[in-house]
């Protein structure tokens, strides 16, 4: 009788999840020993780069009892954000910035958190006196291994979660519960011998199947990294100004992707002309990207990325705008502008940089100027 009651409760919770717009529902145990070991090894290899929050939350990621005492079950949820077909054709338009598909929409954290809170009410109503904790990739939780255990998909060689029915274009979220619930069947891995994601990566960030060196990943370089983008990766970034979808674009399983019915995830902005973006002031940036995930990297982060993309654009029309941007108040932006001018103008940029050198005080900008000067002096 108790089992029948529990089954009915789970059915009601699952139905509510789908009613709220989630596309996948599964339940698993909080025990992830192997994934925890792999995570610690990944950290020890330095693959987290400057994402120090990863190491700070290591203990909690490996033991979810430190997140919710006496946690017994994890309800894993999937939310499709696929809005439009995407191909590698964006590389044919170097004057336009490429944005990760998920970031063309409103910030998913706000949308999904609201839905999770609604589902949380249903859980607490069905499972009386239970304690819960919700997450939308913002806390110390190994959500992809958990989602794999919960049957929502398998972790692919690119380290994204894949499913046979909708590919990988979706967000994950979780609700921790201190009640023992029947577990879903774990998903099987269907990557086989495919290497498409590994071979397409512009920076060779997938150092081996299922292992990503974040320090090389363009998503890390354009979003997580707060400082200067290492010179050796700038050409490979191309016109990608927020994230990178290459490994997902070429994945065969994404041919099964189904467009989301979520109105909030319909693309709200797709015009990212680099010359327009490099001219954005602080107020214009805030207005344009209000409610967008892009606001996370702030104006200085976005224009840093735009400067790199302009350097890769082979567009001489960008030069006057880059020269003007040498006066930007943000040293991080100015530093990458210097590199971009070197790429577009060659040695002709030296007089401009020499003039700027006399008034520049910031070390990161001075280093870039000296690097460009050295490069062309050696070649002269």
List where the protein language model places each region.
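Short inter-helical turns and helix N-cap capping residues of alpha-solenoid HEAT/ARM repeat scaffolds
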Residues: 299, 329-330, 361-362
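Structural detector for internal amphipathic alpha-helices that build alpha-solenoid repeat scaffolds
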Residues: 303-313, 334-346, 366-379
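Amphipathic alpha-helical scaffolding segments comprising HEAT/armadillo-like alpha-solenoid repeats
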Residues: 284-288, 315-327, 346-358, 379-380
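C-terminal amphipathic alpha-helical segment
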Residues: 233-267, 284-295, 301-308
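Immediate flanking context of iron-sulfur cluster ligation sites
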Residues: 183-192, 234-242
């Amino acid at each position: 009788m108790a089992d029948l009651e529990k089954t009915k409760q789970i059915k009601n919770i699952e139905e509510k999840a789908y009613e709220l717009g989630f596309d996948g529902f599964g339940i698993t145990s909080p025990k992830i020993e192997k994934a925890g070991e792999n995570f610690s090894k990944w950290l020890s290899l330095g693959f987290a780069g400057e994402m120090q929050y990863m190491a700070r939350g290591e203990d909690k990621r490996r033991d979810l009892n430190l997140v919710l005492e006496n946690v017994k079950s994890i309800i894993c949820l999937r939310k499709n954000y696929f809005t439009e077909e995407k191909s590698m054709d964006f590389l044919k338009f170097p004057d336009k910035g490429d944005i990760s598909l998920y970031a063309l929409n409103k910030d998913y954290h706000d949308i999904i958190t609201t839905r999770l809170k609604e589902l949380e009410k249903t859980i607490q109503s069905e499972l009386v006196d239970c304690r819960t904790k919700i997450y939308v990739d913002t806390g110390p939780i190994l959500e992809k291994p958990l989602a794999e255990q919960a049957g929502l998909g398998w972790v692919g060689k690119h380290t994204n979660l894949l499913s046979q029915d909708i590919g990988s274009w979706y967000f994950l979220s979780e609700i921790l519960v201190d009640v023992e619930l029947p577990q879903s069947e774990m998903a099987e891995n269907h990557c086989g011998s495919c290497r498409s994601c590994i071979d397409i990566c512009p920076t060779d960030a997938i150092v081996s199947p299922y292992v990503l060196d974040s320090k090389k990943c363009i998503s890390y370089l354009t979003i997580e990294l707060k400082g200067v983008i290492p010179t050796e990766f700038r050409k490979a970034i191309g016109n990608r100004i927020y994230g990178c979808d290459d490994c997902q674009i070429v994945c065969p399983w994404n041919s099964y992707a189904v467009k989301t019915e979520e109105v909030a995830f319909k693309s709200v902005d797709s015009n990212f002309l680099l010359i327009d973006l490099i001219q954005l002031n602080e107020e214009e940036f805030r207005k344009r990207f209000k409610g967008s995930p892009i606001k996370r990297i702030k104006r200085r982060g976005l224009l840093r990325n735009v400067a790199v993309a302009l350097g890769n654009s082979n567009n001489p029309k960008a030069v006057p705008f880059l020269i003007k941007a040498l006066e930007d108040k943000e040293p991080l932006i100015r530093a990458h502008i210097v590199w971009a001018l070197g790429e577009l103008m060659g040695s002709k940029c030296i007089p401009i940089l020499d003039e700027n050198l006399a008034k520049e005080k910031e070390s990161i900008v001075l280093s870039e100027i000296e690097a460009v000067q050295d490069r062309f002096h050696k070649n002269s």
